[in-house]
Amino acid sequence: MSGNGVFRDPPGGRKAVAVWSIGVAVYFVAVIFRTSLGVAGLEAADRFHVNASALSTFSILQLLVYAGMQVPVGLMVDRLGTKKVLTLGAVLFTAGQIGFALSPSYGMALAARALLGCGDAMTFISVLRLGTRWFPARRGPLMAQLAGLVGMAGNLVSTLVLAPVLHGVGWVQAFAGSAVAGVVVLVPLVLFLKDHPEGHEPPVRAGGGGFVRRQIRDSWQEPGTRLGLWVHFTTQFPAMVFLLLWGMPFLVEDQGLARTTAAGLLTLVVASNMGFGLLYGQLIGRRQSARIPLALGTVGLTALLWAATLAHPGPHAPMWLLVTLCVVLGTCGPASMIGFDFARPANPPDRQGTASGITNMGGFLASMTTLLAIGLLLDATGDDYRIAFSSVFAVELLGLTQILRLRPRALARERTRLAAVRPPSTPSAPSAPSASAAAAASAAPADPADSPRPAPA
């Protein structure tokens, strides 16, 4: 922070990459643990002798804890800093994974997944905060997409590594062995991670109940924060539901695929996510006007492919259609990151954690709702996956309505803020103000590279 109270852009560089890499390594392990049930759903049903509704409760409880923790975690990150929150998160999700491995009963396994969800909830917002503290603001969209890409790599490990290990050595050895990764990432986290570069310390706000209420109120009042939440809500959940629990049973039990083939399709979703993550990050980093078209295009294409798959005549959809569906589901994760690209410019640096927490609730609330709906509908219809997965369309319609309602207000406010911080046009001032300075005044575009152009209409 400069002497006049304006935030300077962090320098980036090799040290920033090293510190950020420690944070995303923690997130990588958290995603492995989060998605491990997705490749063990059928085994979990056998181990704990539960039906589809009870099985979905594992993921629903985990997501309920995760979503409920987002605002408290955002406040903790704003108040305590990234290192303390990430360390606590790593301890909790490692303990949860060990507990899940050793649980002899359904109730104890539920408690372990709740503990895992609590620790998992502390990782992603912390990594986003690291990105904004260590890298220039123009890198914000790309760093967020890269963090999401690393998370999807964790999902890939669950599919390609944990699944065969589970089938080879058994439940306890597979889950307890994977928990070692949580211990491994704790070491560099405790020894080397720094919250911010020297000379870029955030302001210290007074704590207490007033701080909490003010942070939540001010973040929520911003249309950009609410638009970010609904973009995240609408775009993330189709892939999350598919990967977290119901994709494998759908492909094996409803579509008649072998487990190895189904695992390959789950891997395709992850690989597609990683590829589209880089593409979306580059597009949004260069032109913010791409945010809404990318988000709405992803929602529309996802709905179209699900409709084609579920409505296909005959007992099974053709393989080419399932492959296309999985490729399109891979765009959901990158599209959900667009939500943060609306919340980020709407809030100053000392409110980024809270605003990110509110935004991050969206997709997990939608996922939790859809996971429960699918489980209940499967039990009610005698495992009719076509009816059960139709619940996806109702949730997408709700989110789409809110995006269209909030879009004009959020973009109008963004234009107003951009105009307020744009310096007079003179030959000696060719560049736009830094996004960090604008954010300190609660008035910055997400990507200053777009500042000389009119904001999107």
Task: State the predicted function of each range.
Residues 2-13, 196-229, 420-426:
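Juxtamembrane intracellular "pre-TM" segments in multi-pass secondary transporters
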Residues 69-81, 276-290:
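Helix-to-loop junctions at the C-terminal end of transmembrane segments
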Residues 68-107:
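Conserved MFS/SLC helix-loop-helix module at the cytosolic interface between two early adjacent transmembrane helices
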Residues 146-197:
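Helix-loop-helix hairpin linking two adjacent transmembrane segments in secondary transporters
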Residues 49, 81, 102-108, 136, ...:
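Helix-breaking motifs and short loop linkers at transmembrane-helix boundaries and internal kinks
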Residues 112-151:
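Cytoplasmic helix-loop-helix junction between adjacent transmembrane helices
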Residues 37-38, 223-278, 370-371, 375:
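Extracytoplasmic gate region of multi-pass secondary transporters
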Residues 79-89, 285-300:
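Cytoplasmic membrane-interface "Motif A"-like loop-to-helix N-cap segments
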